[in-house]
Structures are given as structure tokens and as C-alpha cells.
Swiss-Prot record:
Keyword NADP in record: yes
Stated name of the protein: Dihydrofolate reductase
Gene Ontology cellular-component terms listed: mitochondrion
Gene: DFR1
Entries under Pfam families matching the protein: DHFR_1
Length: 192
């Protein structure tokens, strides 16, 4: 079986690409949460599902009643884990490569955080796409951040919205979505 398509999906505050403060996201964007769920669960092939890969700290930050994330295979990475299928919905693995050897019937793989996983895997050749929700705020310096993406975006090409629409499928994509003081847009990037 061929390896599935691997994409990073993340919401980040421009211009510094901040993604968190004290282990939490410093915003609650209702439509962005819906987009995340729709994109990470949507499949086009029958009898397949998608996988979400996250670090152990991200897994632990999800309230227990919401774990595992439904309708997706949840892969939790930690250097201290042995590669092990826990049940039909959860896999523990020590690396992205070893986790992909344990999966079958997976259409797409989405890396969902946290920062250490994002910043390590951005340079992994398995990652072919970035789905970045670019968030703007009138005074971004007023939003407390202690966690940032270290993405070499000069090695990536931002795709037109039509390519994003093809990639995400049925999901309706608005422009300049406003929630509170935040404005955001969904973007797709591919390697140069």
C-alpha cells in the first residue's frame, strides 16, 4: 500500500506565526474549529478514514471526553513510546515514519500539533501540504504568545484559493472571516 498524503494543519497569528500561550490557543474561532473538523474527517474513497498525528502534550490537552477525536485515527507521537496499536482509534508511535507503517485504510494524514511536532515535521519530506489558517488582529502584539511556528515559508508556495478548494473538497471557504477582533483566511501551501 502506498503512503498516504501528509499535511500540516494549523492556525497561526500573523506576522510572527504565533500558535499558543501556556499550552492553549489564545483564541476560540468557531468557524475555524468547524473547518478543522470538516477537513480532517472528509474522505473521498469508500472504507477509508483520515489520521491525525499529534504530540503527547497535545493529546493530553484535549479534554478526556473529546478523546480520541471522533471519525479519525488518532496517532500520538512520543520519543518514549513503543510503536503500538492501542485500539481501533488510537496508535502510539515514536516517529511519523513508524506510525505510517502501522496504518491501513487511511486516505490522508494531518499533523495537528503541537509546536514541537510542527517545527520538527515541517522539514520531513513526507509532508507535502500546509493548511495554514492565517489569523490577523489589529494589534497582534496585544495577544500573549509564547509558542511560534518556525516554518521556512520561503521553501513553500502559497496556492490560489481554487487549489485549496480542490484539496479540501466540499468545505465552504469564505474570505476574511471575522470573529471578535480576529480576521482570518484559509490557505494552502505546497513545496517549491
Amino acid at each position: 500500500m502506498s503512503k498516504p498524503n501528509v499535511a500540516i494543519i494549523v492556525a497561526a497569528l500573523k506576522p510572527a506565526l504565533g500558535i499558543g500561550y501556556k499550552g492553549k490557543m489564545p483564541w476560540r474561532l468557531r468557524k475555524e474549529i468547524r473547518y478543522f473538523k470538516d477537513v480532517t474527517t472528509r474522505t473521498t474513497k469508500p472504507n477509508t478514514r483520515n489520521a491525525v498525528i499529534m504530540g503527547r502534550k497535545t493529546w493530553e490537552s484535549i479534554p478526556q471526553k473529546f478523546r480520541p477525536l471522533p471519525d479519525r485515527l488518532n496517532i500520538i507521537l512520543s520519543r518514549s513510546y513503543e510503536n503500538k496499536i492501542i485500539d481501533d482509534n488510537i496508535i502510539h508511535a515514536s516517529s511519523i515514519e513508524s506510525s505510517l507503517n502501522l496504518v491501513s485504510d487511511v486516505e490522508r494524514v494531518f499533523i495537528i500539533g503541537g509546536a514541537e511536532i510542527y517545527n520538527e515535521l515541517i522539514n520531513n519530506s513526507l509532508v507535502s501540504h500546509l493548511l495554514i489558517t492565517e489569523i490577523e488582529h489589529p494589534s497582534p502584539e496585544s495577544i500573549e504568545m509564547d509558542t511560534f511556528l518556525k516554518f521556512p515559508l520561503e521553501s513553500w508556495t502559497k496556492q490560489p484559493k481554487s487549489e485549496l478548494q480542490k484539496f479540501v473538497g466540499d468545505t465552504v471557504l469564505e474570505d476574511d472571516i471575522k470573529e471578535g477582533d480576529f480576521t482570518y483566511n484559509y490557505t494552502l501551501w505546497t513545496r517549491k
